UniProtKB/Swiss-Prot annotation:
Keywords: Cobalamin, Cobalt, Isomerase. This is Glutamate mutase epsilon subunit. Adenosylcob(III)alamin binds at G68, N123, P180, F297, K326, E330, I334. L-glutamate binds at R66, R100, R149, H150, E171, Y177, Y181. The keyword Isomerase applies. The gene is glmE. Catalyzes the carbon skeleton rearrangement of L-glutamate to L-threo-3-methylaspartate ((2S,3S)-3-methylaspartate).
Length: 483
Protein backbone atom coordinates (compact mmCIF):
# COMPACT_ATOMS: atom_id res chain seq x y z
CA UNK A 1 0.00 0.00 0.00
CA UNK A 2 1.05 3.55 -0.66
CA UNK A 3 1.42 5.69 2.45
CA UNK A 4 -0.92 8.63 2.79
CA UNK A 5 -2.81 10.14 5.72
CA UNK A 6 -6.19 8.85 4.61
CA UNK A 7 -8.55 6.49 6.38
CA UNK A 8 -8.18 2.97 4.99
CA UNK A 9 -11.20 1.64 3.15
CA UNK A 10 -12.89 -1.51 4.51
CA UNK A 11 -11.55 -3.36 1.48
CA UNK A 12 -7.92 -2.28 2.08
CA UNK A 13 -8.16 -3.11 5.77
CA UNK A 14 -9.79 -6.54 5.41
CA UNK A 15 -7.46 -7.54 2.58
CA UNK A 16 -4.42 -6.87 4.77
CA UNK A 17 -6.08 -8.58 7.77
CA UNK A 18 -6.09 -11.88 5.91
CA UNK A 19 -2.29 -11.73 5.62
CA UNK A 20 -1.74 -10.45 9.18
CA UNK A 21 -3.78 -13.20 10.84
CA UNK A 22 -1.66 -15.84 9.08
CA UNK A 23 1.60 -14.63 10.66
CA UNK A 24 1.19 -17.05 13.60
CA UNK A 25 -1.32 -19.86 14.32
CA UNK A 26 -3.09 -17.91 17.11
CA UNK A 27 -4.21 -15.38 14.49
CA UNK A 28 -6.90 -17.91 13.53
CA UNK A 29 -8.57 -17.35 16.92
CA UNK A 30 -9.52 -13.77 16.01
CA UNK A 31 -13.13 -13.42 14.87
CA UNK A 32 -14.06 -9.74 14.67
CA UNK A 33 -17.80 -10.12 15.21
CA UNK A 34 -17.30 -12.48 18.14
CA UNK A 35 -14.68 -10.06 19.55
CA UNK A 36 -17.14 -7.15 19.31
CA UNK A 37 -19.73 -9.17 21.24
CA UNK A 38 -17.14 -10.10 23.89
CA UNK A 39 -15.86 -6.52 24.26
CA UNK A 40 -19.39 -5.15 24.63
CA UNK A 41 -19.93 -7.38 27.67
CA UNK A 42 -16.86 -5.99 29.50
CA UNK A 43 -18.04 -3.74 32.37
CA UNK A 44 -17.19 -0.01 32.15
CA UNK A 45 -14.78 -0.22 35.09
CA UNK A 46 -12.65 -2.68 33.06
CA UNK A 47 -12.73 -0.59 29.87
CA UNK A 48 -9.57 1.53 29.58
CA UNK A 49 -11.12 4.28 27.45
CA UNK A 50 -14.17 4.67 29.68
CA UNK A 51 -12.16 4.71 32.92
CA UNK A 52 -9.89 7.43 31.47
CA UNK A 53 -12.93 9.56 30.59
CA UNK A 54 -14.14 9.20 34.18
CA UNK A 55 -10.72 10.12 35.64
CA UNK A 56 -10.51 13.17 33.38
CA UNK A 57 -13.98 14.35 34.35
CA UNK A 58 -13.20 13.93 38.05
CA UNK A 59 -9.85 15.70 37.64
CA UNK A 60 -7.85 12.93 39.28
CA UNK A 61 -4.52 11.34 38.33
CA UNK A 62 -4.45 7.55 38.12
CA UNK A 63 -1.46 5.23 38.51
CA UNK A 64 -0.35 2.44 36.18
CA UNK A 65 2.74 0.23 36.58
CA UNK A 66 4.70 -1.68 33.95
CA UNK A 67 4.79 -5.47 34.33
CA UNK A 68 5.01 -8.67 32.31
CA UNK A 69 6.44 -12.19 32.62
CA UNK A 70 6.66 -15.25 30.37
CA UNK A 71 4.23 -17.69 32.01
CA UNK A 72 0.48 -17.12 31.95
CA UNK A 73 -0.33 -18.09 35.55
CA UNK A 74 2.64 -16.15 36.92
CA UNK A 75 1.63 -13.13 34.84
CA UNK A 76 -1.87 -13.26 36.32
CA UNK A 77 -0.42 -13.62 39.82
CA UNK A 78 1.82 -10.59 39.22
CA UNK A 79 -1.03 -8.40 37.94
CA UNK A 80 -3.32 -9.42 40.79
CA UNK A 81 -0.61 -8.50 43.27
CA UNK A 82 -0.15 -5.05 41.69
CA UNK A 83 -3.93 -4.62 41.75
CA UNK A 84 -4.59 -5.85 45.31
CA UNK A 85 -1.37 -5.03 47.14
CA UNK A 86 -0.09 -2.14 45.01
CA UNK A 87 -3.45 -0.45 44.48
CA UNK A 88 -2.94 0.21 40.75
CA UNK A 89 -5.77 1.97 38.88
CA UNK A 90 -4.88 0.47 35.49
CA UNK A 91 -2.95 -2.68 34.66
CA UNK A 92 -0.35 -3.23 31.94
CA UNK A 93 0.94 -6.23 30.16
CA UNK A 94 4.46 -5.36 29.12
CA UNK A 95 5.23 -7.47 26.05
CA UNK A 96 8.54 -9.35 25.66
CA UNK A 97 11.35 -8.33 23.30
CA UNK A 98 10.96 -11.29 20.88
CA UNK A 99 7.29 -10.41 20.27
CA UNK A 100 8.37 -6.82 19.64
CA UNK A 101 10.51 -8.10 16.77
CA UNK A 102 7.78 -10.54 15.56
CA UNK A 103 10.02 -13.52 16.46
CA UNK A 104 7.22 -15.76 17.73
CA UNK A 105 9.24 -19.00 17.33
CA UNK A 106 11.74 -17.72 19.86
CA UNK A 107 8.88 -16.68 22.17
CA UNK A 108 7.66 -20.28 22.05
CA UNK A 109 11.13 -21.48 23.09
CA UNK A 110 11.21 -18.82 25.81
CA UNK A 111 7.91 -20.06 27.23
CA UNK A 112 9.14 -23.69 27.24
CA UNK A 113 12.49 -22.77 28.81
CA UNK A 114 10.69 -20.65 31.43
CA UNK A 115 8.46 -23.61 32.30
CA UNK A 116 11.56 -25.80 32.73
CA UNK A 117 13.40 -23.19 34.80
CA UNK A 118 10.36 -22.38 36.93
CA UNK A 119 10.86 -18.64 36.36
CA UNK A 120 10.43 -16.11 33.57
CA UNK A 121 13.23 -16.13 31.02
CA UNK A 122 11.49 -13.52 28.86
CA UNK A 123 11.34 -9.81 29.71
CA UNK A 124 7.59 -9.61 29.23
CA UNK A 125 4.35 -11.38 28.35
CA UNK A 126 4.31 -13.09 24.90
CA UNK A 127 0.75 -12.05 24.02
CA UNK A 128 0.72 -13.33 20.43
CA UNK A 129 1.81 -16.83 21.47
CA UNK A 130 -0.88 -17.08 24.16
CA UNK A 131 -3.45 -15.81 21.69
CA UNK A 132 -6.96 -14.52 22.28
CA UNK A 133 -7.76 -17.26 24.81
CA UNK A 134 -4.68 -16.48 26.90
CA UNK A 135 -5.29 -12.73 26.80
CA UNK A 136 -8.90 -13.24 27.88
CA UNK A 137 -7.78 -15.46 30.72
CA UNK A 138 -5.63 -12.57 31.98
CA UNK A 139 -8.45 -10.03 31.67
CA UNK A 140 -10.97 -12.29 33.41
CA UNK A 141 -8.58 -12.86 36.33
CA UNK A 142 -8.33 -9.15 37.24
CA UNK A 143 -10.73 -6.29 38.05
CA UNK A 144 -9.04 -3.47 36.16
CA UNK A 145 -8.63 -2.38 32.51
CA UNK A 146 -5.67 -3.86 30.62
CA UNK A 147 -3.26 -2.25 28.18
CA UNK A 148 -0.52 -3.73 26.02
CA UNK A 149 2.74 -1.81 26.53
CA UNK A 150 5.59 -2.85 24.29
CA UNK A 151 7.82 -1.18 21.68
CA UNK A 152 6.81 -3.00 18.51
CA UNK A 153 7.38 -1.38 15.09
CA UNK A 154 4.95 -3.90 13.49
CA UNK A 155 2.26 -4.46 16.08
CA UNK A 156 -0.52 -5.57 13.73
CA UNK A 157 -0.99 -9.17 14.88
CA UNK A 158 -0.41 -8.22 18.52
CA UNK A 159 -3.11 -5.52 18.24
CA UNK A 160 -5.57 -7.99 16.69
CA UNK A 161 -5.00 -10.51 19.49
CA UNK A 162 -4.99 -8.18 22.48
CA UNK A 163 -8.12 -6.28 21.42
CA UNK A 164 -10.02 -9.50 20.65
CA UNK A 165 -8.70 -10.64 24.04
CA UNK A 166 -10.55 -7.79 25.74
CA UNK A 167 -7.61 -5.45 26.34
CA UNK A 168 -9.01 -1.99 25.64
CA UNK A 169 -5.80 -0.02 25.16
CA UNK A 170 -2.71 -0.32 22.99
CA UNK A 171 0.38 1.82 23.46
CA UNK A 172 2.64 2.98 20.63
CA UNK A 173 2.76 4.58 17.22
CA UNK A 174 4.58 4.61 13.91
CA UNK A 175 7.25 7.00 15.19
CA UNK A 176 7.39 6.33 18.92
CA UNK A 177 7.59 2.53 18.57
CA UNK A 178 10.09 2.63 15.72
CA UNK A 179 12.76 5.30 16.09
CA UNK A 180 13.58 4.62 19.79
CA UNK A 181 13.35 0.82 19.42
CA UNK A 182 14.55 -0.34 16.00
CA UNK A 183 17.54 0.22 13.74
CA UNK A 184 16.45 -0.90 10.26
CA UNK A 185 12.68 -0.32 10.01
CA UNK A 186 11.75 2.46 7.57
CA UNK A 187 9.49 5.23 8.86
CA UNK A 188 7.12 4.52 5.97
CA UNK A 189 6.73 0.85 6.97
CA UNK A 190 6.07 1.54 10.65
CA UNK A 191 3.59 4.33 9.83
CA UNK A 192 1.65 1.96 7.56
CA UNK A 193 1.69 -0.81 10.16
CA UNK A 194 0.42 1.55 12.85
CA UNK A 195 -2.25 2.89 10.49
CA UNK A 196 -3.48 -0.71 10.51
CA UNK A 197 -3.50 -0.81 14.33
CA UNK A 198 -5.40 2.49 14.43
CA UNK A 199 -7.83 1.38 11.72
CA UNK A 200 -8.56 -1.74 13.79
CA UNK A 201 -9.45 0.48 16.76
CA UNK A 202 -11.50 2.65 14.39
CA UNK A 203 -13.39 -0.47 13.28
CA UNK A 204 -14.23 -1.33 16.88
CA UNK A 205 -15.38 2.26 17.52
CA UNK A 206 -17.73 1.96 14.53
CA UNK A 207 -19.25 -1.09 16.25
CA UNK A 208 -19.72 0.88 19.50
CA UNK A 209 -16.68 -0.50 21.35
CA UNK A 210 -14.45 2.14 22.94
CA UNK A 211 -10.70 1.48 22.82
CA UNK A 212 -7.89 3.79 23.94
CA UNK A 213 -4.69 4.45 22.00
CA UNK A 214 -1.59 5.91 23.63
CA UNK A 215 1.38 7.27 21.68
CA UNK A 216 4.61 6.60 23.61
CA UNK A 217 5.72 10.00 24.91
CA UNK A 218 9.22 9.52 26.36
CA UNK A 219 10.75 8.18 23.10
CA UNK A 220 14.41 7.42 23.95
CA UNK A 221 13.86 8.58 27.54
CA UNK A 222 17.06 10.61 27.45
CA UNK A 223 16.99 14.42 27.46
CA UNK A 224 14.26 14.66 24.81
CA UNK A 225 13.27 18.35 24.51
CA UNK A 226 9.53 18.77 25.24
CA UNK A 227 8.76 20.36 21.86
CA UNK A 228 10.23 17.38 19.98
CA UNK A 229 8.36 14.73 21.99
CA UNK A 230 5.17 16.83 21.87
CA UNK A 231 5.46 17.16 18.07
CA UNK A 232 5.69 13.35 17.83
CA UNK A 233 2.70 12.84 20.15
CA UNK A 234 0.52 15.34 18.27
CA UNK A 235 1.52 13.77 14.93
CA UNK A 236 0.62 10.26 16.12
CA UNK A 237 -2.67 11.54 17.57
CA UNK A 238 -3.61 13.14 14.23
CA UNK A 239 -2.67 10.00 12.27
CA UNK A 240 -4.71 7.84 14.68
CA UNK A 241 -7.73 10.14 14.51
CA UNK A 242 -7.77 9.89 10.70
CA UNK A 243 -8.16 6.10 11.02
CA UNK A 244 -11.12 6.50 13.38
CA UNK A 245 -9.56 6.44 16.85
CA UNK A 246 -11.72 8.42 19.30
CA UNK A 247 -9.92 8.05 22.65
CA UNK A 248 -6.27 9.14 22.70
CA UNK A 249 -3.82 9.55 25.57
CA UNK A 250 -0.83 11.69 24.64
CA UNK A 251 2.27 11.11 26.74
CA UNK A 252 5.29 12.92 28.07
CA UNK A 253 8.40 11.70 29.87
CA UNK A 254 9.63 13.71 32.84
CA UNK A 255 12.64 15.91 32.07
CA UNK A 256 13.07 17.01 35.69
CA UNK A 257 12.51 20.76 35.92
CA UNK A 258 9.07 21.12 37.49
CA UNK A 259 8.04 24.29 35.64
CA UNK A 260 9.16 22.92 32.26
CA UNK A 261 7.48 19.55 32.83
CA UNK A 262 4.16 21.11 33.87
CA UNK A 263 4.35 23.52 30.93
CA UNK A 264 5.13 20.65 28.55
CA UNK A 265 2.22 18.46 29.64
CA UNK A 266 -0.26 21.33 29.48
CA UNK A 267 1.03 22.41 26.06
CA UNK A 268 0.77 18.83 24.84
CA UNK A 269 -2.89 18.58 25.81
CA UNK A 270 -3.80 22.05 24.52
CA UNK A 271 -1.98 21.73 21.20
CA UNK A 272 -3.22 18.16 20.60
CA UNK A 273 -6.80 19.42 20.98
CA UNK A 274 -6.08 22.50 18.84
CA UNK A 275 -4.60 20.48 15.95
CA UNK A 276 -7.33 17.80 16.12
CA UNK A 277 -10.05 20.45 15.89
CA UNK A 278 -8.20 22.40 13.17
CA UNK A 279 -8.20 19.27 10.99
CA UNK A 280 -11.84 18.41 11.65
CA UNK A 281 -11.50 15.69 14.30
CA UNK A 282 -14.08 17.12 16.69
CA UNK A 283 -15.09 13.99 18.58
CA UNK A 284 -11.74 12.76 19.91
CA UNK A 285 -11.41 12.56 23.70
CA UNK A 286 -7.87 13.51 24.74
CA UNK A 287 -6.19 12.59 28.03
CA UNK A 288 -2.58 12.82 29.16
CA UNK A 289 -0.04 10.46 30.70
CA UNK A 290 3.11 11.50 32.56
CA UNK A 291 5.99 9.02 32.71
CA UNK A 292 8.09 9.03 35.84
CA UNK A 293 11.82 9.51 35.17
CA UNK A 294 12.87 7.32 32.23
CA UNK A 295 16.63 7.83 32.50
CA UNK A 296 19.23 6.28 34.79
CA UNK A 297 18.10 5.71 38.40
CA UNK A 298 20.08 5.74 41.65
CA UNK A 299 20.80 2.20 42.92
CA UNK A 300 19.90 3.09 46.50
CA UNK A 301 16.19 2.26 47.03
CA UNK A 302 15.47 5.23 49.29
CA UNK A 303 16.94 7.58 46.68
CA UNK A 304 14.89 5.82 44.00
CA UNK A 305 11.71 6.52 46.01
CA UNK A 306 12.77 10.17 46.04
CA UNK A 307 12.86 10.15 42.23
CA UNK A 308 9.47 8.38 42.06
CA UNK A 309 7.70 10.78 44.43
CA UNK A 310 9.19 13.90 42.82
CA UNK A 311 7.87 12.72 39.45
CA UNK A 312 4.45 11.97 40.94
CA UNK A 313 4.29 15.48 42.40
CA UNK A 314 4.93 16.98 38.97
CA UNK A 315 2.30 14.71 37.35
CA UNK A 316 -0.30 15.72 39.93
CA UNK A 317 0.42 19.45 39.78
CA UNK A 318 0.40 19.32 35.96
CA UNK A 319 -3.04 17.69 36.00
CA UNK A 320 -2.05 14.50 34.15
CA UNK A 321 -4.81 11.90 33.78
CA UNK A 322 -2.41 9.04 34.38
CA UNK A 323 1.11 8.49 35.68
CA UNK A 324 3.35 5.57 34.70
CA UNK A 325 5.08 4.19 37.77
CA UNK A 326 8.74 3.27 38.17
CA UNK A 327 10.08 0.98 40.89
CA UNK A 328 12.88 1.22 43.47
CA UNK A 329 14.63 -1.61 41.54
CA UNK A 330 14.87 0.44 38.33
CA UNK A 331 18.69 0.68 38.44
CA UNK A 332 19.09 -3.05 39.10
CA UNK A 333 16.83 -4.72 36.53
CA UNK A 334 13.36 -6.26 36.28
CA UNK A 335 11.69 -5.61 39.65
CA UNK A 336 10.16 -8.15 42.02
CA UNK A 337 6.40 -7.89 42.39
CA UNK A 338 6.98 -6.46 45.88
CA UNK A 339 9.25 -3.68 44.57
CA UNK A 340 6.76 -2.91 41.80
CA UNK A 341 3.90 -2.66 44.32
CA UNK A 342 6.07 -0.44 46.54
CA UNK A 343 6.53 2.01 43.65
CA UNK A 344 2.76 2.13 43.10
CA UNK A 345 2.07 2.67 46.81
CA UNK A 346 4.54 5.55 47.04
CA UNK A 347 3.00 7.06 43.89
CA UNK A 348 -0.58 6.66 45.13
CA UNK A 349 0.26 8.24 48.49
CA UNK A 350 1.70 11.32 46.81
CA UNK A 351 -1.29 11.50 44.43
CA UNK A 352 -3.74 11.25 47.33
CA UNK A 353 -2.00 14.04 49.23
CA UNK A 354 -1.98 16.30 46.17
CA UNK A 355 -5.51 15.51 44.95
CA UNK A 356 -7.16 18.60 43.49
CA UNK A 357 -4.01 20.73 43.69
CA UNK A 358 -2.64 22.34 40.53
CA UNK A 359 0.36 24.52 39.79
CA UNK A 360 -1.09 28.02 39.30
CA UNK A 361 -0.05 30.09 36.29
CA UNK A 362 3.06 32.19 36.90
CA UNK A 363 5.30 34.34 34.74
CA UNK A 364 7.83 31.48 34.52
CA UNK A 365 5.20 28.89 33.58
CA UNK A 366 3.66 31.22 31.00
CA UNK A 367 7.07 31.88 29.39
CA UNK A 368 7.94 28.18 29.25
CA UNK A 369 4.56 27.30 27.70
CA UNK A 370 4.99 30.01 25.06
CA UNK A 371 8.46 28.68 24.14
CA UNK A 372 7.33 25.03 23.95
CA UNK A 373 4.26 25.89 21.85
CA UNK A 374 6.29 28.04 19.45
CA UNK A 375 8.97 25.34 19.02
CA UNK A 376 6.36 22.60 18.52
CA UNK A 377 4.50 24.70 15.95
CA UNK A 378 7.73 25.26 13.96
CA UNK A 379 8.25 21.49 13.69
CA UNK A 380 4.63 20.61 12.84
CA UNK A 381 4.18 23.45 10.33
CA UNK A 382 7.29 22.28 8.46
CA UNK A 383 6.01 18.67 8.46
CA UNK A 384 2.72 19.70 6.84
CA UNK A 385 4.69 21.79 4.34
CA UNK A 386 7.01 18.87 3.47
CA UNK A 387 4.03 16.56 3.00
CA UNK A 388 2.12 19.18 0.98
CA UNK A 389 -0.68 18.90 3.53
CA UNK A 390 -0.34 15.14 4.08
CA UNK A 391 1.05 14.51 7.57
CA UNK A 392 2.01 10.87 6.94
CA UNK A 393 4.17 11.80 3.94
CA UNK A 394 5.38 14.85 5.87
CA UNK A 395 6.55 12.59 8.70
CA UNK A 396 8.68 10.46 6.37
CA UNK A 397 10.19 13.59 4.83
CA UNK A 398 10.69 15.18 8.26
CA UNK A 399 12.96 12.29 9.24
CA UNK A 400 14.73 12.34 5.86
CA UNK A 401 15.53 16.03 6.32
CA UNK A 402 16.15 16.01 10.09
CA UNK A 403 13.18 18.30 10.79
CA UNK A 404 12.06 15.65 13.26
CA UNK A 405 15.10 14.28 15.07
CA UNK A 406 15.00 12.10 18.20
CA UNK A 407 18.11 12.37 20.40
CA UNK A 408 20.03 9.09 20.82
CA UNK A 409 17.56 7.14 18.63
CA UNK A 410 19.02 3.88 17.27
CA UNK A 411 17.14 4.11 13.96
CA UNK A 412 19.31 4.64 10.89
CA UNK A 413 16.43 6.73 9.50
CA UNK A 414 16.89 9.27 12.31
CA UNK A 415 19.32 12.11 11.51
CA UNK A 416 20.85 12.25 14.98
CA UNK A 417 22.10 15.79 14.35
CA UNK A 418 20.08 17.50 17.07
CA UNK A 419 21.69 17.43 20.52
CA UNK A 420 19.96 18.35 23.79
CA UNK A 421 21.43 19.53 27.11
CA UNK A 422 20.13 21.01 30.36
CA UNK A 423 20.20 24.71 31.15
CA UNK A 424 21.16 26.11 34.56
CA UNK A 425 17.74 25.29 36.07
CA UNK A 426 17.66 21.78 34.62
CA UNK A 427 15.30 22.52 31.71
CA UNK A 428 16.15 20.50 28.59
CA UNK A 429 17.22 22.83 25.76
CA UNK A 430 18.65 22.44 22.27
CA UNK A 431 22.48 22.45 22.21
CA UNK A 432 22.77 21.57 18.50
CA UNK A 433 19.71 22.33 16.37
CA UNK A 434 20.65 20.09 13.45
CA UNK A 435 17.92 20.72 10.86
CA UNK A 436 15.12 21.39 13.34
CA UNK A 437 13.36 24.39 11.74
CA UNK A 438 13.36 26.99 14.52
CA UNK A 439 13.24 30.75 14.12
CA UNK A 440 16.34 32.74 15.00
CA UNK A 441 14.49 34.08 18.05
CA UNK A 442 13.89 30.55 19.38
CA UNK A 443 17.49 29.53 18.69
CA UNK A 444 18.78 32.57 20.56
CA UNK A 445 16.52 31.83 23.53
CA UNK A 446 18.02 28.33 23.77
CA UNK A 447 21.57 29.68 23.42
CA UNK A 448 21.02 32.30 26.13
CA UNK A 449 19.73 29.69 28.59
CA UNK A 450 22.81 27.52 27.98
CA UNK A 451 25.18 30.47 28.37
CA UNK A 452 23.71 31.05 31.85
CA UNK A 453 24.74 27.53 32.80
CA UNK A 454 28.19 27.88 31.25
CA UNK A 455 28.79 31.06 33.23
CA UNK A 456 27.56 29.49 36.49
CA UNK A 457 29.73 26.39 36.04
CA UNK A 458 32.77 28.25 34.76
CA UNK A 459 33.09 26.15 31.60
CA UNK A 460 32.15 26.37 27.93
CA UNK A 461 28.87 24.97 26.62
CA UNK A 462 29.94 21.58 25.25
CA UNK A 463 29.12 17.92 24.71
CA UNK A 464 30.70 17.19 28.10
CA UNK A 465 27.63 18.82 29.68
CA UNK A 466 25.42 16.34 27.80
CA UNK A 467 27.41 13.37 29.13
CA UNK A 468 27.32 14.79 32.66
CA UNK A 469 23.53 15.29 32.41
CA UNK A 470 22.89 11.73 31.21
CA UNK A 471 24.50 10.23 34.32
CA UNK A 472 23.43 12.91 36.83
CA UNK A 473 20.22 11.42 38.29
CA UNK A 474 21.87 8.04 38.80
CA UNK A 475 24.52 9.89 40.80
CA UNK A 476 21.98 11.72 42.92
CA UNK A 477 21.17 15.05 41.24
CA UNK A 478 19.34 16.49 38.22
CA UNK A 479 22.01 18.61 36.51
CA UNK A 480 25.43 17.19 35.63
CA UNK A 481 27.61 19.75 37.34
CA UNK A 482 31.39 19.49 36.96
CA UNK A 483 33.03 17.55 39.81
Amino acid sequence: MELKNKKWTDEEFHKQREEVLQQWPTGKEVDLQEAVDYLKKIPAEKNFAEKLVLAKKKGITMAQPRAGVALLDEHIELLRYLQDEGGADFLPSTIDAYTRQNRYDECENGIKESEKAGRSLLNGFPGVNYGVKGCRKVLEAVNLPLQARHGTPDSRLLAEIIHAGGWTSNEGGGISYNVPYAKNVTIEKSLLDWQYCDRLVGFYEEQGVHINREPFGPLTGTLVPPSMSNAVGITEALLAAEQGVKNITVGYGECGNMIQDIAALRCLEEQTNEYLKAYGYNDVFVTTVFHQWMGGFPQDESKAFGVIVTATTIAALAGATKVIVKTPHEAIGIPTKEANAAGIKATKMALNMLEGQRMPMSKELETEMAVIKAETKCILDKMFELGKGDLAIGTVKAFETGVMDIPFGPSKYNAGKMMPVRDNLGCVRYLEFGNVPFTEEIKNYNRERLQERAKFEGRDVSFQMVIDDIFAVGKGRLIGRPE
